[in-house]
Amino acid sequence: MSTDLNYSATRDPFSALGLDVGNRRIGVAGSDGLGLLATGLGVIRRRSLPEDIAQVQAWIRRRQATVVVVGIPLLADGSVGSQARKVQRFVRALQAAVDLPVVTVNEYLSTVQAEWDLRQAGIPAKAQKALIDQQSAAVILQTWLDERRYSQSSKAPCR
């Protein structure tokens, strides 16, 4: 069995935008052109649903995104709570406003992972507050990218 190291590099250009939708802020992350790595990009301060959607659309244009990935904060048992319902409403509004796929992933514990990542990177606790939303978006997007890559590789024929 051989490994095709050029597999990812031969695909069409790819740009995913990841969102961590909270009550006050929306963390924004983006993927590299190969769909391998997610990086936190910034934060949208929430104002109103139409303004929030317009800000996301601006990020989509800026990044030339081909897909938007939104984290849904499911409860520990996988059920939908009040915060998840709020995010689902946001997702429906976004889907109506953009002409590209908007997919959701379970973001359970993404903030915990983001805090750990920032600590491991040596970011002081005071500085973490400003970065946590975009890092959570990066965790959400990275989860989706990894799942996408693994599902594609499991479908690839063995050589």
Curated annotation (Swiss-Prot):
Q: What is its EC number?
A: 3.1.-.-
Q: Chloroplast: is it a keyword of this entry? A: no
Q: What class of enzyme is it?
A: hydrolase
Q: InterPro entries per the record? A: RNaseH-like_sf (IPR012337), YqgF (IPR005227), YqgF/RNaseH-like_dom (IPR006641), YqgF/RNaseH-like_dom_sf (IPR037027)
Q: Where in the cell is it found?
A: Cytoplasm
What's a BP term from Gene Ontology annotated to this protein? rRNA 5'-end processing
Q: Which GO terms describe its cellular component?
A: cytosol
Which CDD domains does UniProt cross-reference here?
YqgF (cd16964)
Task: Note the coiled coil stretches, chain numbering.
Answer: none
Which keywords describe this protein according to UniProt? Cytoplasm, Hydrolase, Nuclease, Ribosome biogenesis
SMART domains, per database record: YqgFc
Q: Which domain of life is it from?
A: Bacteria
The terms under GO molecular function for this entry are: nuclease activity
Q: Where is this protein chiefly located?
A: cytoplasm
Q: Which PANTHER family match?
A: POLYNUCLEOTIDYL TRANSFERASE, RIBONUCLEASE H-LIKE SUPERFAMILY PROTEIN
Q: What does this protein do?
A: Could be a nuclease involved in processing of the 5'-end of pre-16S rRNA.
Q: Which family does it belong to?
A: Belongs to the YqgF nuclease family.
Put simply, this protein is called: Putative pre-16S rRNA nuclease
**Organism ancestry:** Bacteria, Bacillati, Cyanobacteriota, Cyanophyceae, Synechococcales
